[in-house]
Amino acid sequence: MGEQPIFTTRAHVFQIDPSTKKNWVPASKQAVTVSYFYDVTRNSYRIISVDGAKVIINSTITPNMTFTKTSQKFGQWADSRANTVFGLGFSSEQQLTKFAEKFQEVREAARLARDKSQEKIETSSNHSQESGCETPSSTQASSVNGTDDEKASHASPADTHLKSENDKLKIALTQSAANVKKWEIELQTLRESNARLTTALQESAASVEQWKRQFSICRDENDRLRSKIEELEEQCGEINREKEKNTQLKRRIEELESEVREKEMELKDLRKQSEIIPQLMSECEYVSEKLEAAERDNQNLEDKVRSLKTDIEESKYRQRHLKGELKSFLEVLDGKIDDLHDFRRGLSKLGTDN
């Protein structure tokens, strides 16, 4: 356009969905520059935003427009000429407030510009009507003076000039009337479009309320799900503790099974040893029998010793002869007795060990 912007900010741009008139459709993928401009040629104010090479907002501000804040960072206005509703999402509430204040200022300036334009049109129309009314009176006055020849000779250049001016004024008056009619039609169209946009704005406000309710429901659902997740996490913690206990129990079971296997090996060894016990018992009985036989032999030998002593006492003669033999015999007997005692001690020890 060539003019410098009056005010510039950055925001995310949205447009109302033309089919539903409820949902917002993003017009920019990211925050873009949004500016107020004054169009000198048309004596109007515009809001313009460009995303790359694409013009996403070209809205002429009229005195009937209203900028509405729908949240802390979002505002919207209806453009009847574009037959749509624009929405702007700002990064802060302060930016939204500045944009809304500038909108009010520009709207007031647009109203003053419109009033001045209407005053000029009315002044031009009144001037045309006055000029049209003066022309017949001048012609009548000129026809009163002199004869017809004099009127023809003296008034001809003036009549021609007045007639030409009158025709121009009539054309201007006709064009002015046509423009007034055109503006009335355009005004009616704007009123109807404004009514439709007002309805769309009300529906949009209702939709915002519905979104707020849905957001509240979603937030409650989110809180409920968060509580459920915390419960599940707590249950998972209990499950992990149970798993750890199960792992410890499995480890203990494995240790007990190892001990059982060791005990089974010991029991198996004891069973093998128990199979040897009867053999040892039979050997013990055999040794006992031998011991009894040895004891009997010992008893017999003792009897013989007593008998021999008696014989010695009875016959000292035989004592000298048999002394050496008896001494050797006693030595042999003592050795056998010692062996017998050693054998008995070994047998007793064996019985104790078993």
Curated annotation (Swiss-Prot):
Key word Cytoplasm present: yes
Coiled coil (UniProt feature): 92-120, 160-329
PROSITE patterns: WH1
Disulfide bonds: none
UniProt record, GO biological process: behavioral response to cocaine; calcium-mediated signaling; G protein-coupled glutamate receptor signaling pathway; negative regulation of calcineurin-NFAT signaling cascade; negative regulation of interleukin-2 production; regulation of G protein-coupled receptor signaling pathway; regulation of store-operated calcium entry; sensory perception of sound
GO CC annotations on file: apical part of cell; cytoplasm; dendrite; glutamatergic synapse; intracellular organelle; neuronal cell body; plasma membrane; postsynaptic density
GO molecular function: actin binding; G protein-coupled glutamate receptor binding; glutamate receptor binding; identical protein binding; protein domain specific binding; protein-containing complex binding; synaptic receptor adaptor activity
Record flagged with keyword Repeat: no
Residue ranges annotated for the WH1 domain, each copy included: 1-110
Composition bias type Polar residues, residue spans: 123-146
Keywords for the protein's UniProt record, in alphabetical order: Cell membrane, Cell projection, Coiled coil, Cytoplasm, Hearing, Membrane, Synapse
Tissue: Constitutively expressed in the adult hippocampus.
Top-rank lineage group of the source organism: Eukaryota
A Pfam entry, by short name: WH1
Residue ranges of the region described as Disordered: 114-163
Gene3D superfamilies noted in UniProt: 1.20.5.1700, Pleckstrin-homology domain (PH domain)/Phosphotyrosine-binding domain (PTB)
Compartment(s) of residence: Cytoplasm; Cell membrane; Postsynaptic density; Synapse
Biological role: Postsynaptic density scaffolding protein. Binds and cross-links cytoplasmic regions of GRM1, GRM5, ITPR1, DNM3, RYR1, RYR2, SHANK1 and SHANK3. By physically linking GRM1 and GRM5 with ER-associated ITPR1 receptors, it aids the coupling of surface receptors to intracellular calcium release. May also couple GRM1 to PI3 kinase through its interaction with AGAP2. Isoforms can be differently regulated and may play an important role in maintaining the plasticity at glutamatergic synapses. Required for normal hearing. Negatively regulates T cell activation by inhibiting the calcineurin-NFAT pathway.
Domain comment (free text): The WH1 domain interacts with the PPXXF motif in GRM1, GRM5, RYR1, RYR2, ITPR1, SHANK 1 and SHANK3.
Family the entry assigns: Belongs to the Homer family.
PANTHER family membership: HOMER
Subunit structure: Isoform 1 and isoform 2 encode coiled-coil structures that mediate homo- and heteromultimerization. Interacts with NFATC2; interaction is reduced by AKT activation. Interacts with NFATC1 and NFATC4. Interacts with DAGLA (via PPXXF motif); this interaction is required for the cell membrane localization of DAGLA.
Name of the protein described by the UniProt record: Homer protein homolog 2
Organism of provenance: Rattus norvegicus
Lineage: Eukaryota, Metazoa, Chordata, Craniata, Vertebrata
